[in-house]
Amino acid sequence: GIDGSAAAGRNDGQEPAQITRHKKGRWQLSIVLFGLADKGEINMEQLAFRKARPEDLAQVFALFTDAIHTMDKDGIPQWDEVYPDERTLKEDIEHGQMYLAELEERPAAVFVLNLEYDPQYANGVWAEPDSFLVLHRLCVSPRVQNRGLGKLTVQAAEARAAALGVKALRLDAFKQNPYALRLYERMGYRIVGDVVFRKGPFFLMEKQLG
């Protein structure tokens, strides 16, 4: 399953982020948030994206724990102590598949890119059958929700996937998470099928890149 806290990316009218290469191997997202200052929203100019390291695990696990508590309060029973657990996150880091968004030198969002997916993905009518990656465990810290970070994090995942040469991103989205569904649909992800996991029904979604 993918995301609970991608719901954080509810920033309509935002210009696409521009991504440039950082000399230390990070991606810099230069962000201009038009009109948000008048709404009391935080006005960020930069996020730093990088691969997660073993020493990040404690902060990453805390971020997911906070997100799970927030989703529970919002009536979104998508994640729990079973998934995503600390072992799963540790393996994501060890395999070099987890990426962090740092805001003010603290992890603010996380995503995972790999080629792992449930056999039920065969239910999807995929437009791109061969050249793709799968987006998992997209999570935005509750402390920065509703400030556009969900959208920016998805954009960073798309940019990374494109840089790796693939033509599409796939994901599964919990049907009881309206915030995530709205985010993905607005960003051009198409519903291509249905699956049922332990926590209930999910949509299979796909976006062709480039």
Where are the language model's segments positioned?
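C-terminal "cap" of GNAT-fold acetyltransferases
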Residues: 127-132, 167, 173-181, 185-187, ...
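Conserved GNAT acetyl-CoA-binding A-motif
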Residues: 154, 161-172
